[in-house]
From Swiss-Prot:
Subcellular locations according to the entry: Cytoplasm
Active site (UniProt): 119 (nucleophile), 144
Highest taxon above the source species: Bacteria
Organism (species): Bordetella petrii (strain ATCC BAA-461 / DSM 12804 / CCUG 43448)
Record field: transmembrane: none
Gene (UniProt): clpP
The keyword Ubl conjugation is assigned to this record: no
Name used for this protein in its record: ATP-dependent Clp protease proteolytic subunit
Length: 217
């Protein structure tokens, strides 16, 4: 019997593609002429070109998602990739690495919110290919301005303040392009946490359609 865990682990230097911090991960066992193959559920779904952004956006998350995007592009540059998002957000820098790679790869990247897409999670949700950005009916989407804590000498705080203001301007400009909203409205609407229902997110331009069933996609 031949048994494998993490079918695509080798492309990460032996590391799993499974999102971290999820506790018990179901395994899928497939029978073949060579015996049994066991995959964690996320590695199995990667074969179907499904990538999951689950939990906070951080360097580890970004590295895994970027690697999976590039791998799926190399597998088939003409077939769509689906990115499922259930994330409270996190690092702007890590999120921008994912965003840039989504735009860089040749396949269209379709996005789907399952639960919550907040902060950088919402930013990445809106970054999917226009016409292919979806949300489930009871999901929540939240946008706001970037936040950060500054400490140190006055000159250090000034440098960090300039950086976060530059990031806010950049994020607002990209969000305006992806939603069709004026950048002035984006600036106002992201001043504080701005929660939206699935229908509100469609009206705002963050997503294109609410999906109640797979047949509607």
């Amino acid at each position: 019997m031949q048994r494998f865990t993490d079918f695509y682990a080798s492309m990460h230097g032996g590391a799993s593609v499974t999102p971290t911090g999820l506790g018990y991960i179901p395994m899928v066992i497939e029978q073949s002429g060579r015996g049994e193959r066991a995959y964690d559920i996320y590695s199995r779904l990667l074969r179907e070109r499904l990538i999951f952004l689950v939990g906070p956006v951080n360097d580890n998350t970004a590295n895994l998602i970027v690697a999976q995007l590039l791998f799926l592009e190399s597998e088939n540059p003409d077939k769509d990739i689906s990115l499922y998002i259930n994330s409270p957000g996190g690092s702007v820098y890590a999120g921008m690495a994912i965003y840039d790679t989504m735009q860089f790869v040749k396949p269209d990247v379709s996005t789907l919110c399952t639960g919550l897409a907040a902060s950088m999670g919402a930013f990445l949700l809106a970054a999917g290919k226009k016409g292919k950005r979806f949300t489930l009916p009871n999901s929540r989407i939240m946008i706001h301005q970037p936040s950060g804590g500054a400490q140190g000498q006055a000159s250090d705080i000034q440098i960090q303040a300039r950086e976060i203001l530059d990031l806010r301007e950049r994020l607002n400009r990209i969000l305006a392009e992806n939603t069709g909203q004026p950048v002035e409205r984006i600036a106002v609407d992201t001043e504080r946490d701005n929660f939206m229902s699935a229908e509100d997110a469609v009206s705002y331009g963050l997503v294109d359609k609410v999906l109640a069933s797979r047949s509607e996609g």
